[in-house]
A protein has these predicted regions:
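Acidic, serine/threonine/proline-rich low-complexity intrinsically disordered regions
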Residues: 782-806
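Short beta-to-alpha loop/turn elements within the nucleotide-binding domains of ABC transporters
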Residues: 647, 727, 756
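A structural signal for short, well-ordered beta-strand elements
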Residues: 613, 722-725, 754
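Short, surface-exposed tryptophan/glycine-enriched loops
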Residues: 607, 724-725, 736
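C-terminal interaction modules of eukaryotic adaptor/scaffold proteins
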Residues: 734-785
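Alpha-helical transmembrane segments and immediately membrane-proximal extracytoplasmic
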Residues: 2-639, 643-660, 664-702, 708-717, ...
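C-terminal accessory/binding modules appended to enzymatic or scaffolding proteins
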Residues: 716-717, 721-726, 731
């Protein structure tokens, strides 16, 4: 069955559902609620006020936004606004200019917000660059003329040495100790700030932002407090020497900036769709200021961050990135005209025989990405299981270990951006760093670069995900740059050994043939592409870093090979892997699923539903208090289960609270969810009270104190998305991706049979993958060696052995220092059969049950 045959079936399913519901209602009765923009203009019900809509649209923490209903509410808000100001909008003449001015302001409000956001992001990035460079250099020495200057500013214009910049002592060992304790101090301050004031400031934030833009609600993750702590702790974490970068956190604080500024404008405060546009544009600006690449930032936002990216969002993302980079260039934090330290320009060309080495760099990038992602997830699981109670200790120990390992290596002890600036350069023009370009030092440099590549890779694996602001872009680029420069030096040595070889026949004799700096540049692009699984945006970012069209083709080849190699080891970059690890309800547009099963295999059967009439209000309140369901299907009665609509948890809670505040709820009051049931209740009340039907309307009953029946029909969605139980699961997942509903109801001939959410789809996907892994494990030789029984004792894992080793070392060290060994207690989180604690019977994905939320490696 193909997708072209499924779409008409889905349309027929919805049309039949509408016809069935309409057939149950008299044609002269309007069923649209006042908050529904589908209501006719002559509807006699009072229009919904904007305050009511804003209350309904408040989403709870760890819930998903229903983009379909959000669009409905936004249209209703606009209609209510037009109705409330109808006299003002109709004015012309002397008052017409006021209307036109207001319309112009409302239309240009988005551009005002984007401009303010871009300016704030650019200014914040410039300040962070200046602070980071000074803190990184202060561990190595100080400026005797001005303590507040870093090494580059202190030595500005110096040609033969720099007497103004002094190391802390003249002894190498004392400088080593000072470097070590400086790293401990900076990392401890960063970890304490994050743990005490803003736990959400830890980590990179890109994976969470992807989920937030897709509609996942995480209150506080983009708040002002997170923005402040992230901006303060990020320079401290980078300057401590940890193998973490600022590019991922730059996206986080940029999106925080966009969220905070947009909240001052009512157009965005109550509109999730509008806010999504600003968040997407802010993410583009964050990448733009991090790499000095405005076009690359826009493409990164398109390729990686947003599931929904219309042309309007593209243009605003471009403008926001333009404003941010313009402000950064105006501040000019490095006083060189460069937006980032490692910008470089190449005036040489490449040769076709170098394609062999370029392909090798691409293979390295793919292998690096697969290796780091695999082992970083193992470290994340270990961190969650054993180290969640000691986030500060973990960060300090990592910083100390990094300082001990990195200081002896000339490429590891300096800042990673400064390292890439050195490795990217051509040797001509006086660009020499500690003999890097000297032929007699060639093989010692190769050895140092190899050590730097290996150590940096290991440090990236154990550092990314610790409880400080930590990105992985620049550390990966640093690994690729050191490996690429090493390859470039060896190729240069090969050429100098065999200059007359036919292999190098295309080289000109009067100019250098091999430029090792270009290999470092391409290696950095390969490693970045390997860890993120991106292609187009990485190519453009690397192009904007060099400004040379000459190296577009080599960059495309390297990135393409990296992508091909990386896909052999699994789909998705590090951000996608962390989303899966944390169990967030996120469906990636880049994934293609083939299950060949109907939606009934993944749906939640027998969901809790509400009868359309005669349902006690007290029972509804108990229902809300006793469970965390985020919505309820409404059926005619619980016996027939004929579907009539759907009401969300927020809507039901607001309706009950509003009725109680207005004194319309009696102790034995009952709620109705359809107009037919409401009118039937009015008729029964009228017959009992012996009033005329014409005078005793339902509105009058509602206005009387202690009404026996309360009408909630205005809060019910009477046309929810529905599918047939035999509808393909793949098509249902596409509906979630393209339309963004919170829940899709499953009905057969009008009868409710179940419901399906994003988490239902993910649960089924994980179940299928687990079965495939089990099948592969049972067919392996190791399984046969165990006797072919699944109930054998589970062998000790690598994480368990590593934890026992840490306990032994900690006990030995504490015993030598204090005389009494201290044993770290076990903190074992029970293994879950599923990636997130999803209850078996629930009504939607609304609440992600993140057990031990503090234990999450990136989301404390």
């Amino acid at each position: 069955m193909t997708s072209t045959r499924l779409s008409p079936a889905f349309d027929r399913s919805r049309s039949v559902s509408r016809q069935r519901r309409n057939s149950r209602r008299p044609s002269e009765r309007s069923t649209a609620s006042p908050v529904d923009p589908r209501a006719d203009s002559d509807n006699q019900e009072p229009p919904a006020i904007p305050e009511e809509i804003s209350e309904i649209k408040r989403y709870e923490d760890f819930t998903t936004i229903d983009w379909v209903q959000d669009a409905v509410y936004e249209q209703s808000r606009r209609r209510a606004k037009r109705r409330s100001g109808s006299g003002f909008w109709d004015q012309e003449g002397i008052f017409g200019w006021r209307r036109k001015m207001y319309e112009s302001y409302d239309a240009g409000q988005s551009w005002l917000v984007v401009t303010l956001v871009g300016m704030a992001i650019g200014l914040n990035s410039a300040v962070l660059n200046i602070i980071t460079e000074w803190l990184s250099d202060i561990k190595l020495g100080h400026c005797t003329t001005a303590f507040y200057l870093n090494e580059s500013f202190c030595c500005w214009g110096a040609e033969n040495g720099c007497p103004e910049w002094k190391h802390w002592t003249s002894f190498w060992l004392f400088n080593y100790v000072f470097y070590f304790f400086g790293a401990l101090l900076l990392s401890s301050i960063a970890a304490v700030l994050v743990k005490s004031f803003a736990p959400y400031a830890a980590g990179s934030g890109i994976s969470e932002i992807k989920c937030i833009i897709a509609g996942f609600v995480m209150k506080g993750f983009l708040g002002a407090w997170t923005l402040l702590i992230k901006s303060i702790a990020l320079p401290l974490a980078i300057a401590s020497g940890l193998s973490v970068g600022k590019e991922g956190p730059s996206v986080h604080f940029a999106v925080c900036t966009g969220n905070v500024i947009s909240r001052f404008f009512g157009k965005y405060k109550q509109n999730a769709s509008k806010t999504r546009e600003i968040l997407t544009a802010s993410a583009a600006a964050g990448v733009a200021v991090a790499f000095g690449s405005p076009i690359g930032g826009v493409l990164f936002s398109l390729e990686e961050m947003a599931n929904y990216f219309p042309l309007k969002t593209l243009w605003r993302s471009y403008f926001c990135a333009l404003v941010a980079t313009s402000v950064l260039a105006a501040v000019n934090p490095f006083r060189t005209g460069q937006l980032v330290m490692f910008q470089v320009e190449y005036d040489r060309t490449w040769h076709f025989f170098e394609f062999i080495f370029f392909i090798g760099l691409g293979v390295f990038g793919g292998l690096y990405g697969a290796f780091v992602m695999k082992w970083n997830l193992r470290v994340a699981a270990f961190r969650k299981k054993y180290l969640s109670q000691w986030p500060i200790t973990e960060s300090v120990v990592l910083a100390g270990l990094t300082a001990i390992l990195c200081y002896p290596n000339m490429f590891l002890k300096i800042n990673m951006t400064a390292m890439m600036e050195i490795l990217f350069r051509e040797c001509e023009g006086g660009h020499d760093y500690d003999g890097l370009c000297q032929p007699q030092n060639r093989w010692s440099m190769v050895f140092s670069l190899a050590i730097a590549t290996i150590l940096r890779t290991g440090l990236v694996i154990i550092s990314y995900g610790c409880k400080v602001p930590a990105g992985i872009f620049v550390p990966s680029m640093a690994v690729g740059a050191s490996f690429g420069r090493m390859v470039g030096i060896m190729v240069q040595a090969l050429y100098e050994s065999f200059p007359q070889s036919a292999f190098f026949a295309s080289c000109d004799p009067d100019v250098p043939c091999i430029t090792p700096g270009t290999y470092a540049f391409l290696g950095a692009g390969a490693a970045l592409s390997g860890i993120m699984h991106l292609t187009i945006s990485i190519t453009v970012i690397m192009f904007e870093l060099t400004g040379a069209l000459t190296y577009i083709l080599p960059t495309m080849i390297v990135v393409g090979v990296t992508k091909a190699v990386g896909d052999r080891f699994g789909s998705g970059g590090i951000a996608d892997r962390m989303i899966w690890f944390n169990g967030f309800p996120f469906l990636d547009n880049k994934e293609d699923h083939v299950f060949n099963v109907p939606v009934s295999h993944a749906m939640t059967t027998d969901p809790l539903s509400l009868p359309a009439s005669d349902f006690p209000v007290r029972e509804a309140e108990h229902l809300l208090n006793d469970n965390r369901f985020q919505g309820f299907p409404v059926v005619e009665d619980r016996t027939s289960k004929i579907l009539v609509g759907y009401i969300g948890r927020t809507e039901l809670r607001y309706a009950i609270d509003r009725a109680r505040n207005q004194g319309m709820v009696a102790p034995n009051a009952r709620c109705v969810f359809t107009k037919e049931a409401a009118e039937a209740a009015v008729a029964r009340r009228a017959s009992v009270s012996q009033h005329s039907r014409s005078s005793d309307t339902f509105d009058a009953i509602q206005r009387s104190a202690g009404a026996s029946f309360v009408d909630f029909s205005r809060y019910v969605d009477d046309t929810p998305l529905t599918v047939h139980p035999r509808h393909p699961l793949e098509t249902v997942m596409e509906i979630f991706k393209k339309m963004g509903p919170r829940v899709i109801l499953v009905e057969h001939r009008g009868k409710l049979t179940g419901l399906v959410t994003v988490k239902d789809c993910l649960k089924y996907q994980f179940k299928v993958e687990a079965e495939e892994h089990t099948l592969a494990a049972t067919s392996s030789p190791e399984f046969a060696a165990l006797g072919g029984h699944l109930n054998n004792p589970v062998p000790e894992t690598l994480e368990d052995r590593l934890w026992r080793l840490i306990q032994t070392v900690a006990g030995f060290v504490s015993g030598k220092v204090s005389g009494r060994p201290v044993r770290l207690r076990d903190r074992t989180v029970p293994r879950q059969s599923e990636p997130s604690g999803i209850p078996e019977r629930r009504n939607d994905d609304a609440v992600v049950e993140l057990e031990d939320r503090e234990d999450r490696p990136m989301i404390p």
